[in-house]
Curated annotation (Swiss-Prot):
Biological process, per Gene Ontology: ATP synthesis coupled electron transport
Binding residues for Mg(2+): E224
Name the UniProt record assigns to this protein: Cytochrome c oxidase subunit 2
Main localization, broad class: mitochondrion
Amino acid sequence: MIVNECLFFTIALCDAAEPWQLGFQDAATPMMQGIIDLHHDILFFLILILVFVLWILVRALWHFYYKKNPIPQRIVHGTTIEILWTIFPSIILMFIAIPSFALLYSMDEVVVDPAMTLKAIGHQWYWTYEYSDYNSSDEQSLTFDSYMIPEDDLELGQLRLLEVDNRVVVPVKTNLRLIVTSADVLHSWAVPSLGVKCDAVPGRLNQISMLVQREGVYYGQCSEICGTNHAFMPIVIEAVSATDYTNWVSNLFIPPTS
């Protein structure tokens, strides 16, 4: 393929799953960056709520311990505190909801005039890719299947259960339209670094938009249980410069010489 990524480079950028990983993979699209930012914003409010609740709990245990207060206080009504614990949670939910809805709607937006259209078809248990812009005839089409490389055939530096024989090559900083469907059962096309997860449903076309911002190799997997070999349907996206992408396409259409 065009870019030969070593294992160190892939792990350093965190574009593939790692053992014992707890955080996100590095964002390669505005969509994924928005997801990470939203997570951090919500986590800020969660930490504040956690600290406040723990403070109230510790204070109650300390000041209202039964040995210090043998006779419990009988508080049955408090208008002020009831108003406060209704208003403040509502404000917090509003601060969480507004950016989350904005991100949700932006993820559903479809580019009106994409520079490139890619179709992914799920099978048991591999993916078929069609570059629709080049499929002008049966003699000239850009379609291929992508299977997982068996463990015994892996080369040094390749990732177990994540490498494929044919990678999907896309240009960076280009508006892409991805059409996802299935030829048999439910699948799901998901690449964490790109912030993409689209269900592949038989008889239905789902589409999403992508804008890969940096070159690299991005790994994903089928994220919908689809049978015995569900875990062996990896996805590999190789993002290259526009020049390298054009050369890659041109080389595929060069007729073989005898």
